[in-house]
Amino acid sequence: MAIKVLVVDDSSFFRRRVSEIINAESRLEVIDVAVNGKEAVEKAKRLKPDVITMDIEMPVMDGISAVREIMASVPTPILMFSSLTHDGAKATLDALDAGALDFLPKKFEDIARNRDEAVSLLQQRVIQIASKRAFMRRPVASSTPVQERPQSTLNRPTTGLRREASAQAPVSRAPVAAKFRASGKKYQLTAIGTSTGGPVALQKILTKLPANYPHPIVLIQHMPATFTAAFASRLNSLCKIQVKEAEDGDVLQAGVAYLAPGGKQMMIDGRPGAARLRIIDGGERMNYKPCVDVTFGSAAKIYADKVLSMVLTGMGADGREGARMLKSAGATIWAQDEDSCVVYGMPQAVAKAGLSTEDLPLERIAERMLVEVGLA
């Protein structure tokens, strides 16, 4: 049976082209369209589609409000279309907070010209998130920052990210699970790579880490260039640790998370205790910018077995070769488990290659990290 899709957009051109692309895939079927958020909510309740594609800026009711209402009444996998602007990035992150599973940049030119890459990407994303209807969840954390965290020696511009903290993200009451035990290894770096579903996963994990987290964290999230600064700023306002978009020359410091900038590659240079980040273009041959393999590979060279690494939810296999290099250096590699992933691609690639020592549910990754680094 075909996957039923509701297409929501106030642009008649975009509704038509998206519908044509979706219907061109035999496994997908557009069952209806909506021109605003209010109509989307009504049709979601009545038609119960398997997936909804949703614009953000619409009359009557915007996409973010529609996502909130749909998630409260008839939880459905939602794929957002977002403009590649700073405001578009912030709105997209709001939509993910509200419960949307993923987003795609809204590129009219690519859609209009029926470019193979854009067509294939849209079809794949719809198919991937359709499998997660049972996975649907409520918003992960308030975006209202609270309390000042302790001052850090991190050197930032005065116009940079605010040093604010938040209460921990709510944790669902899970059945009593086995207690974790530390391996006894010593670490100097934490490295986390992710893609589809990553913004929510990273928020769940990082908001549970204390300000005294004992070493630097490098984050590689597949995301457009205009999105990473907004995402880093949001995480920074919610977390007790500090989070910033990485800049070339940043000296890695304990208790600070560095998010790889979109459209660039992030590498680590120097030696443990005095390592710096190098932000480079990385060339056109790379499939992902940023690329998890690139950062993981450089971490293996500098920190060897002193890396605690994780591959989280995401499409494809980025991270597998980097994890292989880390494994050869004696580092620790964990993978997010299938049940808690939005897309079980990247973690599956690592697990199937025999590179991960543990496969963990998202809700327990932060707990496992704190045990492993001696904070719990």
From Swiss-Prot:
Keywords: Chemotaxis, Cytoplasm, Hydrolase, Phosphoprotein. GO terms for cellular component: cytoplasm. InterPro entries: CheB-like, CheB_C, CheY-like_superfamily, Sig_transdc_resp-reg_Me-estase, Sig_transdc_resp-reg_receiver. SUPFAM superfamilies: CheY-like, Methylesterase CheB, C-terminal domain. The modification 4-aspartylphosphate is found at D55. Residues 4-121 form the Response regulatory domain. Pfam families: CheB_methylest (PF01339), Response_reg (PF00072). Gene3D superfamilies: 3.40.50.2300, Methylesterase CheB, C-terminal domain. It is found in: Cytoplasm. It is an enzyme of class 3 (hydrolase). Residues 183-376 form the CheB-type methylesterase domain. This is Protein-glutamate methylesterase/protein-glutamine glutaminase 1.
